[in-house]
Amino acid sequence: MYFTYYLKMTEKKSKLAVLKTKETAESVVDFINKISKEELRKDSHIILEMMEKASGEKAKMWGSSIIGFGNKRYKSPTSGREVDWFLIGFSPRKAYLSLYLMTDHKEYATQIEKLGKFKTSGGCFNIKKLQDINLAILKDLIEASL
């Protein structure tokens, strides 16, 4: 799960580390519309719609570059520290979209295998182009994360 990885990395940096990625009041649509690469901007709008529909939640900015849906209180298994975090989310990066899903990769290995062309990093799915992805399977993985 992405969040567990993120929290562990934050805790390794400092015993008293403060989680910097928090919900903000910035406009999600304005953020997406500022993306210079047209294909990445269009793909971001598609993911935005998919995640809003699946979660029933309005998108919120988390930090300066992550779009999250929903809110959950998580407790670190190592430190016991509790923080607020989104249920699912994504971030348009320079070269790809990072999807933050709370899907158990082992449990959904068959679906993930059929998802299409992507890479994983720290529990994220990094996708260069949505046209290389099976959107029906992606929808199922998004729903499984909720």
Language-model features, listed with the residues they occupy:
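Charge-dense, helix-prone N-terminal extensions
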Residues: 2-146
